[in-house]
Amino acid sequence: MSIAEIKKNAEAKMAKSVEAFKNELQKIRTGRAHPGILDQVHVDYYGSNLPLSQVANVTLIDARTISVQPWEKSMAQKIEKAIRESDLGLNPSSMGDLIRVPMPALTEERRKELTKVVRHAGEDSKVAVRNLRRDANDQAKKLLKDKLISEDDERRSVDEVQKLTDRVIAEIDRLVHGKEAEILAV
């Protein structure tokens, strides 16, 4: 394995870590509606536990309301029940075969709670990135120990991985601040 491969590998893993963090942030409810918030809702479909997106069409009506259109009319009650029983704190209402899911306004206390959750998730992502940095540096040290690279090459590799880590952590911080601003906006 070369230094370039170590750096490329670390970069790919760090990008995956940031992508996972973005997905985690999407699941955190803010005052605004977005279809992704219902991704974690599963519905009993003839004995199978399926994600909501596989049994219904989920769209936005406006900034605070999600529309769920079941593909089978008989599923409307099961979908409504699954949304209500999820830990999202949502109260869907059924209008025939269309289910409307209004997003309740967040209380100040809940907003502060959610910002703590966002910060904690951000810290967890940073720890994951730092662990990837450590792994990459350990690989470079092993190459040095096996005399496959010089000390200068090892030092250069450590510096490049550190710059990459700093850039990724800055991206995570930017995402955290953006989500906090979104949560705290009334």
Curated annotation (Swiss-Prot):
Gene3D superfamilies: 3.30.1360.40, Ribosome-recycling factor. Keywords: Cytoplasm, Protein biosynthesis. This is Ribosome-recycling factor. Responsible for the release of ribosomes from messenger RNA at the termination of protein biosynthesis. May increase the efficiency of translation by recycling ribosomes from one round of translation to another. Coiled coil: none annotated. It comes from the Bacteria. SUPFAM superfamilies: Ribosome recycling factor, RRF (SSF55194). Its main location: cytoplasm. It is found in: Cytoplasm. NCBIfam families: frr. GO terms for cellular component: cytosol. GO terms for molecular function: ribosomal large subunit binding.
